[in-house]
Amino acid sequence: YRGCLLGLAVGDAMGYTVDNRSWQEIQEDYGPNGLLGYDLVNGYADVTSYTQLAAFTCNGLLFGLTRGQMLGKMAPFIKYVGMSSREWAASQRPWGRPTRNYCWLLRKAELCRRHCMDTRMLDTLSRQTLGTPETPANNYDSPGGITTAIGVGLFFHEDRTDQHEIDLLGAETVALTQGSPSAFLSGAVLAHIMSRLIRQPHLPLKRLVAEAVEAMKEQFGHQYS
């Protein structure tokens, strides 16, 4: 689990510096072999906004589980993911930080550093109502947005949660801010593959991908062709 999140942090810390740039542009800045290390900020690699958001999603899932175990009752997990996503978004603005914090990650300065340049996502998270697959908040499709589904895939597996519920929650977490079906269905696919890998780590990836595609057709095909 830790290795997966660290892998995201490491990869995005390197990758965001060359995002949306051509190979020629990268070579001009970093030499003929391209980017070979981090662009350090005060001696440290950046914790990017999508890494932060993935971590806060995990925080929300853990908060919901803890509440359920301690109090014997809880709301649907997506409510806690929405709450944690809003608190992260508030940390990315110079104003409007919440007076009551539910996410303990807000005490980690490196996970709250203002790094998000995606104003559309921040605007969506500031609205009174967040998106769902049935009632999308927008038609947005940001590739980094599916990182929110990573926590779902890590947190659940078939032994304790129905696979359809896992896939739906993967879609719902992305749909909070990304209204395009191609975005939130990708979240469902990612959650499906990761949860299955946890249960059966030796299954071939090609088989898992094909299985995930069929599962999406079965679960979402009547709504999205």
Can you say where each PLM-predicted feature lies in the sequence?
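Structured, active/binding-site neighborhoods that engage oxygen-rich ligands
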Residues: 1-225
